[in-house]
Amino acid sequence: MCIRDRFKDVTFSDKDGNTYPGQMPTQWSNLKFFLSYQVNFMYWRYFMWNFAGRQNDIQGLGELEHGNWITGIPFIDNAMYGDQSLLPKTLQENKGHNVFYCLPLILGLIGLFFQAYRGEKGVRQFWVVFFLFFMTGLAIVLYLNQTPSQPRERDYAYAGSFYAFAIWIGLGVAALASWAEKLLKSKPQLAAALASVVGVLVPLQMVSQTWDDHDRSNRYTCRDFGANYLNTLPDKGCPVIFTNGDNDTFPLWYNQEVEGTRTDARVCNLSYLQTDWYTDQMRRPAYDSKPLPITWSRYYYVDNGKHSYYPIRPEHKAELDELKKQNPKVDPYELSYILDHYVKKAEGGYFPTDSVVVSVNKQAVIESGMYLPMGKDSIPDKMIISLKNAQQKQGGLYRNEVMIYEMLAHADWKRPMYMSVTLGPGNYAGLDNYCVLEGLAYRITPFNYGQTVSYTHLRAHETSLHL
């Protein structure tokens, strides 16, 4: 190992305070990572996809057989990745296998130098295109500082850079026309024809390789999943389903907006619920769906930094206990009371306790069609939500989590609420133990099962009790 690669032994701490040994990379190691991964693998590889060729459309994580750039010239490709003819047919015949033989790259380089060496005016034009190329390409690499094992290929982030290089490709055709005109002074029409042929052949080669890459016919997986999520929800009560992120939200939106599927249901994206503009939308009716039960005025959630995070301060429990003594008819631990008197503040609120309760409207629960594990008598009077996990992990609750509580507190169990199965474990707002899987969504119930469970499991358990 080079002396510059020697790491320093250090001790790291995770977010829970646990320590473990590790090694601190050197500045030289960081530089090598920047050049080899962030610049070469995460930019130039994508650049060469577009102007040299692409191995296949399988996401590459450094393997020799997935997602690399190629040229279509065997001795070059074999030198970089091994004998490509030995790859299985599934990879050789992959629709993303595109070979351009570096023709667009060569034409672009010709245009680059042609522009740069056309006198003072050409130099000024060159720098304009160059900085467009740089600022939409390598400058984004510097800004993003990407980590390894990205969830998907990121070539789309640099599309502007590829457009800029396409300007040089166009100038490459102009360069060929200029050179042909000098060689064929007596035949200017022939020179123009030759340049035009080259200018047409290169994009024709590209389109012949890439046309089949973009065939989306008969791809119904996303559409079907979105429809199944919506059809999971009950037909009555204008149900709400919480999603998170783009990929598990857009298929549902497509089904509602384009095909008119379950327009009575409301899809609520928790990633967006952190913002004021999306909260505005959720407070308005949409198609056949009623507004979400958010009673806050806009003043209390406008995005000014004061209403994005709400710390949990259980040391204020004594104040709640004193309030309960003074007025036994009021439960200061009731979620709606906490939200109205402590959280909904102009200067930013907080939770004065690490556990809250939600009163249960038993009649509404029965009428909602919710599965009752042990019959009507098993419905609890209150639902107890622990905030201890949120306090330990992040010290408080973010606005999107608080908005879930706001809806839960004011829906009065008359509006079914569901969590999409694609939600991560940290997106349940502490309601994991109260969720029952129905189809492709977890229904929020007043029953504490100790963990997320499925409806089928509950029915099987109930049956076993009567055997």
Show where each model-derived region lies:
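ER/secretory pathway lumenal C-terminal domains and tails of membrane proteins involved
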Residues: 4-158, 165-238, 250-467
